[in-house]
Design a protein with these regions (language model features):
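Flexible, glycine- and charge-enriched loops at secondary-structure boundaries
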Residues: 14-17, 90-94, 131-138, 179-186, ...
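Catalytic His-Asp segment of secreted/periplasmic serine-dependent ester chemistry enzymes
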Residues: 166-255
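Conserved beta-strand segments of alpha/beta enzyme cores
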Residues: 86-88, 158, 201-203
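Catalytic metal-binding/acid-base residues of hydrolase active sites
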Residues: 72, 120-122, 165, 208-211
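Active-site segments of SGNH/GDSL-like serine hydrolases
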Residues: 118-124, 150-186
């Protein structure tokens, strides 16, 4: 007992030192990760390195469809669509509306029959951490939605603009950077998306209505367990069915 009492302060000091070292290592790794992300965004303002991605299906006869936007568009389950469409993918994870607008200004035009776009959540989900710039960010998103529509009309016969997917319940670690008005902003900007469509060349796919529950959050059956902003295959199956219905109501012009 006496030996334990004598050595307890030493053991506590060793434990504290070990915890301090581990904490500093974790902090250093986090700072390095933040530095890498900051420099990457400065060097690659589109949010991704330049790359050449082939069509998801081989070139050949049939109508073509290009997906644009953020990770929700990049992760869209395109397998079922490939039986009838030649699919191209220009969507990238983390893309904001400003980055998509810049991409459309800089990417050489590759005309396709249909463009499908999902954009907006990456402008809205960081608002809690960017309160000083909120008004400007919201103004810019409104302008970008219209500019993206116009740019896509230059590249395709039809544009399918999807409303912003609802988020799932916000994880605890995300709540400090989550604006409590985010769900309201999602609804408001979905009205902007609706106003940007015309029922002729710009069609609406109301993804939010399909995926959301009564609380305006992503329905549990459609939630991706890995990330609260993502949708699972069941959700994309529902979206694909709706996409086909939208295109059936407004057929492409004959060639």
């Amino acid at each position: 007992m006496a030996w334990t009492s004598v050595n307890w302060p030493r053991r506590a000091a060793v434990a504290f030192l070990a915890a301090s070292v581990l904490g500093n290592v974790a902090l250093a790794l986090a700072l390095h990760d933040s530095f890498v992300k900051l420099q990457f965004s400065r060097i690659f303002p589109l949010g991704h390195a330049n790359e050449s991605r082939p069509a998801a299906t081989p070139a050949g006869p049939g109508r073509s469809m290009t997906f644009w936007g953020d990770s929700r568009s990049a992760m869209w389950d395109k397998e079922d669509l490939q039986t009838k469409w030649r699919i191209f993918d220009e969507a990238h994870g983390g893309t904001t509306s400003s980055q998509l607008r810049l991409l459309l200004l800089t990417l050489p035009p590759n005309r396709t029959d249909v463009s499908v776009v999902q954009i907006g959540i990456n402008d809205l989900h960081p608002l809690g951490a960017l309160g000083a710039h909120k008004a400007e960010l919201l103004k810019q998103l409104r302008l970008n939605i219209v500019a993206i529509r116009d740019a896509l009309l230059e590249r395709s016969d039809l544009v399918v603009f999807t409303t912003i997917f609802p988020p799932g319940p916000v994880p605890l670690l995300r709540r400090a950077a989550w604006d409590p008005l985010t769900l309201q902003y999602v609804r408001e900007f979905n009205e902007v998306v609706r106003d940007a469509t015309d029922g002729r060349r710009v069609l609406l796919l109301d993804a939010h209505t399909i995926l959301s529950g009564a609380d305006s959050l992503l329905q549990r059956e459609y939630a991706d367990l890995d990330f609260f902003l993502h949708v699972n295959r069941q959700g994309y199956a529902a979206l694909n069915a709706a996409l086909m219905q939208v295109l059936e109501r407004q057929p492409l012009p004959s060639k």
